[in-house]
């Protein structure tokens, strides 16, 4: 009887050991697979969008090009002599619809100006702003459309509000973040909602004088 009990205990111990080893092996496999899957086949390269933007400060025009061919042009207002628009090539990665506006700190022209919320009267950004150089350089709309074609801004590129909305839609689509028309309908009809869109593929903007 004692011999039989001893054999049973040994068998139970052996079964427990085998089960423990099997579970340990499964746990190792579960940990290993995600680590391999996390990097396998991932492309971490930044892909630029197929269209490019080109702003010429002397002609006060902004062109949209694809493969060297101009597909759209817009008239813009550029920076005044005291507040020049930066020259160079920049990457557009962010667009804000119904943006709020805060007076740029340490800017003489912005003294005594008060912040404006999304869609608020007197908001100089209008319906959309397209970031091209941090912290405060954008392509945005203007209520003073008569200033287009002149050097009137504080460094940004100003456009007709309808034109800049058209441009922002195009940039979003080409940058891999398209939206349905009902999304834009909501933006236009609910002006107090600020929406930020980050592009999957940056769009290049080159500014020359």
Language model features with spans:
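N-terminal pre-domains immediately preceding structured catalytic cores
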Residues: 2-209
